[in-house]
UniProtKB/Swiss-Prot annotation:
Job description of the protein: Catalyzes the NADPH-dependent reduction of beta-ketoacyl-ACP substrates to beta-hydroxyacyl-ACP products, the first reductive step in the elongation cycle of fatty acid biosynthesis.
Organism (species): Haemophilus influenzae (strain ATCC 51907 / DSM 11121 / KW20 / Rd)
Annotated protein name in UniProt: 3-oxoacyl-[acyl-carrier-protein] reductase FabG
Active site annotation, chain numbering: Y149 (proton acceptor)
Listed SMART domains: PKS_KR
Top EC class of this enzyme: oxidoreductase
Amino acid sequence: MQGKIALVTGSTRGIGRAIAEELSSKGAFVIGTATSEKGAEAISAYLGDKGKGLVLNVTDKESIETLLEQIKNDFGDIDILVNNAGITRDNLLMRMKDEEWFDIMQTNLTSVYHLSKAMLRSMMKKRFGRIINIGSVVGSTGNPGQTNYCAAKAGVVGFSKSLAKEVAARGITVNVVAPGFIATDMTEVLTDEQKAGILSNVPAGRLGEAKDIAKAVAFLASDDAGYITGTTLHVNGGLYLS
């Protein structure tokens, strides 16, 4: 990955940060994005001279265009895109507000469309590109209270398979990494009883770690994975067996 330029959205903390750090450790120059200047500064601090943090609103097409122009001017064309930014707006469908549906779709699915599309011209010209979209186990299993989130993550899989077929002949791979239950800030607030309930369904007997996802992303971004495309790599300790 030496000399490659990677863009990782939503990399202030958790899985996104682990991905950014893993790619930079492999030699890539990583641009990580945050929704605020403070977040971008934090990314720049942990990446040091191996990358830079920048502000991006993934739901705003103009923000995306501005960011990509800045990256091109300052660093060059992007070789590796990791669409990691995502949110949750959980609710039972009967109670779900329209904005809870549309916010999820804009952030978790439409942003993948906009960013991936923006990469294609330069990647096709170079005949090289890696697009890695972060999905979720619930995109395959479903989850009550998350019809919006599950639909978006399932959509990411369908999008990735279709795009993979469109661009494979130009040396571009498009894959999904689908995490199971990963130990992050969000799982820290769970009670011991809630954690035990989750772990009872995980054959591996533990929550995953952010580095487990980062290692999977780094593999798919590498030259070793050049013949793998349109695939969903499930990283979930056996919670879901595809």
